[in-house]
């Protein structure tokens, strides 16, 4: 049922576009902002505007960044001989929370899914291969999600990197099949990283 207020309806529709937010949840959020007065809505609007203006993808690894390079790529104390491949920037956050990894990352921007029209060209696979061919990388850790699409992506990356003289490993299972990195607790992720195995 429409409220008869186009601005209100548009706001509800925009909030409901967010992942996991249905119309009722969006409606509650919008009414909360209205109830709190203009200040909360203004702060939220400013935050969203700053997000779209200041946050972009790292020129090297495609993680989120506020400058040309993300903080991880800029950190000289990290092990630049290790690259951990993940699907999304949120997976970098999950790995960092686990505290077990001190190398660099490469964010693919998704996973292979031919059924959804996502092929190799839709991911940052060429950029990954270019990084590996520049030399200096000892080990490539594949940390795609343990889903069918994640496994297919891991297999593709393995085939892509196989001709290079680097070790290739995959996170150990302790991670549930069908699970997503961002939802794993730090302990499970720590154990999976410590128990990673070679794929060749």
Curated annotation (Swiss-Prot):
Gene3D superfamilies: 3.30.60.80, 3.40.1360.10, 6.10.250.240, RecR Domain 1 (1.10.8.420). Keywords: DNA damage, DNA recombination, DNA repair, Metal-binding, Zinc, Zinc-finger. One of its GO terms (molecular function) is DNA binding. A zinc finger (C4-type) spans 58-73. GO terms for biological process: DNA recombination; DNA repair. InterPro entries: DNA_Rcmb_RecR, Rcmb_RecR, Rcmb_RecR_Znf, TOPRIM_dom, TOPRIM_RecR. Transmembrane segments: none annotated. Residues 81-176 form the Toprim domain. May play a role in DNA repair. It seems to be involved in an RecBC-independent recombinational process of DNA repair. It may act with RecF and RecO. Belongs to the RecR family. This is Recombination protein RecR. It comes from Magnetococcus marinus (strain ATCC BAA-1437 / JCM 17883 / MC-1). The gene is recR.
